[in-house]
């Protein structure tokens, strides 16, 4: 088999056993790798109704067919599980050397189940698997953990959790090399298993069916990746978005009370670059090198737009030193910066309204940087008011009451990213219907709004088709896996991607086949959520966005009405060929071949696998 390895490794931390299992080529072709394969496996390994923080919730790491090839930006891996924040699917991506080592193990997926009695780390060196004591790593930051584990196992690449993951903060991340599988609380799931880290070292190369032809196409993509379509990412990086969005009236400010920030210039990408720039960096196997590291009194720190908005304008913070320090704290604790900023901003407003007196001990007020820093410490350690905030804005607002859910800015429990959707109507729909919750990465629906392809101030039912198409497109990118910053380097994405996949695998793949794969993958996500008690009211936006008009900026006076959103959601369901309430009919699952993907086991419990069956091989006793 080319491109894929045709097997997964299943490790059960409770029994201390591990074994391989074959993966059918039909499933791999139908779901690809990455998030597609991970979603398919989640249906199979997660018992219906499983508690996300229980031992039975699987933590699934997946590779993809393009990982380890000459195609730029493909050193990526996916993490898929049931989210402790939303109760629905959590799928997250991260990058760099850990991704390459996962593929070099000769597996397409690593499935971790069970719970260790004490904190451990998992060490995998090709076919040798060991569970090692990690009690000496408790309380260590993710960076400290990775450094220590690499020293102990001799240079492997490591992914780990910080203290937030140990404490099961519901938006804890899994970190590797300064990057994060960031959203949905995957780090809390890892912490609940008492798994502090995973160290990988492999030696297998990715088999490519037509290496010369692939290398020729890879060279074209590399040249395009250094051209004008990626110029923004290669010059200032994603922090450039803050100033742009402020001018467009889409920059979330003071917990979405405004969409412009009067002090945006103080933390703009241009000012950060002029006063704090340290160096440019990038993931392994990437020519774009979009990362920017900035210096502050607290040290050197990576910073992306989503972190800048969440810890900056969303909380009314205009001090770049404070934003950089806050970002560094989130990295060390292992916290999703979007959910951290969103939850803190909710707490600031709630305290302003006199409903959260314990927040005053942290100094939580809009514009007060010391309060943000204190809150991050409290959340990461689950101490004081941080114990409540560690639950995320949805659960915190339910506990506090007093109508505070009206300004808890989440969808399905996942805090909103850095786009005010009242003046981005396609984006509004994309956020509402996303299986992941409030997410900009699983559709990129904002592109239609920003490009002028549609009227961003007015929504209509036709946006449903736009969002559905963008979700399927993103699903293919996330399952091959290719960085979204490379997307515009493809002239005809589906045709070009099919050609790349054919050269890697030897299949005769078409663009139409990849389109169907994207729809299949997205539908699998939806089906998992339905299995986990999704209801139509979950595809909705926070009350504030449907009640308040934008008060400032070029979008002043623009509103998003419930009727407008309802019309777009219904149009989306029609575009998807789902029923009028958003449930997937059997005819659609049959047309996509979903029920056949895992021998009829999609949506059924298959835990634990018999690791000693003829299809599996028990490894070195653990």
Identify the meaning behind each predicted range.
Residues 603-605, 612-618:
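Charged/polar low-complexity intrinsically disordered segments
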């Amino acid at each position: 088999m080319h491109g894929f390895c045709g097997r997964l490794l299943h490790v059960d931390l409770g029994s201390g056993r591990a074994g391989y299992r074959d993966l059918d080529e039909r499933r791999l072709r139908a779901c690809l790798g990455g998030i597609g394969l991970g979603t398919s496996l989640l249906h199979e390994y997660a018992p219906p109704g499983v508690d996300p923080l229980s031992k039975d919730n699987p933590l699934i790491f997946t590779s993809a067919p393009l990982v380890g090839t000459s195609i730029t930006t493909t050193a990526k891996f996916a993490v898929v599980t049931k989210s402790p924040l939303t109760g629905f699917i959590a799928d997250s991506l991260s990058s760099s050397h850990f991704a390459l080592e996962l593929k070099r193990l000769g597996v397409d997926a690593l499935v971790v189940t069970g719970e260790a009695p004490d904190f451990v780390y998992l060490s995998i060196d090709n076919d040798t698997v060991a569970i090692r004591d990690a009690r000496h790593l408790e309380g260590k930051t993710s960076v400290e953990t990775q450094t220590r584990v690499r020293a102990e196992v001799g240079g492997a690449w490591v992914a780990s959790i910080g203290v937030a993951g140990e404490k099961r903060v519901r938006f804890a991340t899994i970190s590797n090399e300064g990057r994060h599988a960031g959203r949905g609380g995957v780090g809390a799931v890892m912490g609940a298993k008492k798994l502090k880290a995973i160290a990988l070292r492999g030696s297998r190369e990715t088999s490519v069916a037509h290496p010369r032809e692939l290398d020729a196409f890879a060279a074209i993509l590399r040249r395009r990746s250094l051209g004008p379509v990626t110029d923004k990412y290669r010059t200032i990086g994603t922090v450039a978005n803050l100033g742009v969005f402020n001018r467009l009236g889409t920059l979330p400010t003071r917990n979405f009370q405004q969409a412009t920030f009067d002090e945006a210039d103080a933390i703009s990408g241009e000012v950060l670059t002029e006063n704090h720039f340290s160096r440019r960096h990038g993931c392994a196997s990437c020519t774009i090198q979009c990362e920017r590291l900035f210096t502050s009194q607290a040290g050197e720190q990576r910073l992306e737009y989503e972190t800048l908005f969440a810890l900056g304008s969303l909380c009314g913070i205009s001090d770049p030193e404070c934003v950089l320090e806050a970002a560094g704290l989130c990295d060390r604790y292992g916290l999703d910066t979007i959910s951290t900023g969103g939850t803190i901003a909710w707490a600031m407003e709630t305290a302003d309204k006199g409903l959260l007196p314990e927040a005053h001990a942290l100094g939580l007020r809009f514009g007060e940087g010391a309060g943000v820093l204190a809150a991050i410490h409290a959340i990461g350690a689950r101490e004081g008011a941080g114990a409540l905030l560690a639950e995320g804005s949805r659960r915190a607002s339910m506990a506090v009451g007093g109508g505070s859910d009206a300004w808890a800015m989440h969808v399905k429990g996942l805090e909103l990213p850095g786009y005010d959707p009242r003046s981005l109507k396609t984006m509004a729909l994309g956020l509402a219907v996303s299986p992941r919750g409030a997410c900009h990465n699983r559709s990129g629906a904002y592109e239609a709004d920003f490009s002028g392809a549609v009227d961003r101030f007015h929504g209509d039912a036709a946006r449903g088709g736009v969002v559905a198409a963008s979700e399927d497109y993103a699903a293919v990118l996330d399952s091959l896996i290719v960085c979204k910053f490379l997307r515009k380097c493809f002239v005809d994405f589906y045709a070009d991607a099919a050609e790349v996949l054919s050269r890697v695998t030897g299949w005769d793949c078409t663009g139409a086949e990849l389109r169907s794969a994207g729809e299949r993958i997205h539908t699998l996500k939806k089906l998992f959520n339905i299995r986990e008690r999704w209801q139509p009211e979950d595809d909705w936006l926070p009350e504030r966005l449907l009640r308040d008009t934008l008060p400032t900026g070029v979008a002043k006076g623009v509103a998003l009405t419930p009727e407008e959103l309802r019309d777009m959601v219904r149009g989306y369901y029609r575009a998807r060929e789902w029923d009028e309430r958003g449930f997937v009919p059997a005819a659609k699952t049959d047309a996509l071949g979903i029920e056949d993907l895992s021998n009829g086991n999609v949506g059924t419990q298959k835990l634990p696998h018999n690791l000693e069956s003829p299809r599996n091989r028990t490894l070195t006793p653990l």
